[in-house]
């Protein structure tokens, strides 16, 4: 249909105008009036699913990362305990605890307080570890305190148990060092030969001969397993039992001593 002069003017000023609904050329392009829900989902559902998928993936990756870090720290902690115990292990001692058992012992002692502080006092993991270590060593942690009765009760029990456990551990270490020193001294004494001066020092009855008892007593003195005072007390007890002064203890002497 040809345009009028006014339509041509409006076309030049405002651009193309939408065709009227009466134009028959529009009928072939008109879509049927069908609800859009029959063919596609609403647009906001796609956006919501798109937004939730990355969040779920992020949370899963973070949880997996935390689990891996916790497992790695546990392995490192136990490995360090086993390594330290293994380096200080004395091969001469026949009665030794398995290194893994010792590492687990120290792990349980420190980790129990670590969990109590974290879940009861509600502080961070690193602060919980420092707090538990300071509680065990009775140093204290002035910046934090237990505000609930449950936390105070658990802290009281944990302080008592952990302090005794650490004291027992230090006692074990001191005994181990003393035993190691004694074994080294005994090994050195037994590896030495006796000199002339030592011969006269070991000859208790001064008869110019060393009996097995005299030699054993002298070696025990050198190993510091028996002192001169201990030897004197043993001799006094022997003299009390040897009533006949024969240098030997008989059954008659024992019977007389028992009846008295």
UniProtKB/Swiss-Prot annotation:
What GO CC terms are in its UniProt record?
plant-type vacuole membrane
Instruction: Show the stretches that span the lipid bilayer.
Output: 69-89, 153-173
Region of interest: Disordered: 1-34
For whether the record's keyword set contains Transport, the answer is yes
Which sequence ranges are listed under topological domain Cytoplasmic? 1-68, 174-260
Q: Where does Ca(2+) 1 bind?
A: 203, 205, 207, 209, 214
Q: Name one Pfam family in it.
A: Ion_trans_2
Regarding tissue, the record states: Expressed in hydathodes and the vascular tissues of roots, stems, leaves and flowers.
Q: Polar residues bias: where?
A: 18-31
Annotated compartments: Vacuole membrane
What is recorded about the domains? The pore-forming region (also called P-domain or P-loop) is enclosed by two transmembrane segments (1P/2TM) and contains a pseudo GYGD signature motif such as GYFD which seems to be involved in potassium selectivity.
Q: Which purpose does this protein serve, as stated in its record?
A: Probable calcium-activated potassium channel.
Stated family:
Belongs to the two pore domain potassium channel (TC 1.A.1.7) family.
Binding partners and assembly? Homotetramer.
Protein name (Swiss-Prot/TrEMBL):
Potassium inward rectifier (Kir)-like channel 3
User: What organism is this sequence from?
Assistant: Arabidopsis thaliana
Taxon lineage: Eukaryota, Viridiplantae, Streptophyta, Embryophyta, Tracheophyta
